[in-house]
């Protein structure tokens, strides 16, 4: 029974993903998503109580699954700059995929007025930043990083990674970023970050 329930949930997420990407958040309807899945709105609402929660679940399912492996790069026994470079490359590779970029554009355009922005942040980015901050706190304890507010430092590192080509791509100024640009952006972010916060 549980397998069927999870199978249905995944079918809903897959259908919702396509509807949201085609129509955006505001124009998408729970009725249309239910129709695509071949079920009823009642069944849909039994899995996801609101359109906002469904949208966030879709984003977390498809972006979280890609981003999670990046955190495995944060090994305490690695050199700080090497760990951050490895993390940055994996993180940027994940968030530069077409689907993640498309969802971030929807979120940027509709997050404030729909309420999905805070809901997504609390269930996704905030958890990732907290995990990255935990790694940085351990690096401080090991004497490899200056004693600074870890959560703020984590936010700053992510901002460094996302600046430049990726930000311009999300804003529609340029096309997708290349693997070489991902490496360059991650290396530059790690070098800049450790030049200020690292201890040699």
Briefly describe each language-model feature range.
Residues 8, 51, 58, 62-63, ...:
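Hydrophobic/aromatic residues within well-ordered alpha-helical segments
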Residues 11, 15, 19-53, 57-58:
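Helix-turn-helix
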Residues 14, 81-97, 101, 105, ...:
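Amphipathic alpha-helical segments that line or abut small-molecule/effector binding pockets
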Residues 58-87, 93-95:
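Amphipathic alpha-helical linker/stalk segments
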Residues 94, 102, 116-142, 184:
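Amphipathic alpha-helical packing segments from all-alpha helical-bundle domains
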Residues 95-119, 166-171:
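Amphipathic alpha-helical segments used for helix-helix packing
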Residues 118, 136, 140-191:
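Hydrophobic/aromatic-rich alpha-helical bundle segments in the mid-to-C-terminal region
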């Amino acid at each position: 029974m549980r397998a069927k329930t999870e199978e249905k949930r995944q079918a809903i997420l897959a259908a919702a993903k396509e509807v949201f990407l085609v129509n955006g958040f505001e124009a998408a309807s729970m009725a249309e998503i239910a129709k695509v899945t071949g079920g009823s709105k009642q069944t849909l609402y039994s899995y996801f109580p609101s359109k906002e929660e469904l949208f966030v679940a879709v984003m977390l399912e498809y972006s979280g699954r890609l981003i999670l492996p990046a955190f495995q790069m944060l090994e305490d026994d690695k050199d700080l700059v090497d760990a951050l470079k490895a993390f940055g490359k994996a993180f940027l590779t994940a968030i530069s995929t077409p689907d993640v970029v498309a969802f971030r554009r929807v979120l940027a355009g509709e997050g404030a007025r729909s309420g999905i922005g805070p809901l997504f942040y609390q269930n996704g980015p905030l958890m990732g930043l907290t995990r990255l901050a935990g790694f940085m706190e351990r690096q401080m304890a090991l004497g490899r990083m200056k004693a600074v507010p870890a959560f703020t430092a984590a936010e700053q590192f992510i901002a460094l990674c996302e600046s430049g080509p990726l930000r311009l791509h999300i804003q529609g100024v340029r096309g997708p970023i290349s693997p070489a640009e991902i490496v360059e952006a991650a290396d530059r972010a790690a070098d800049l970050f450790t030049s200020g916060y690292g201890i040699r």
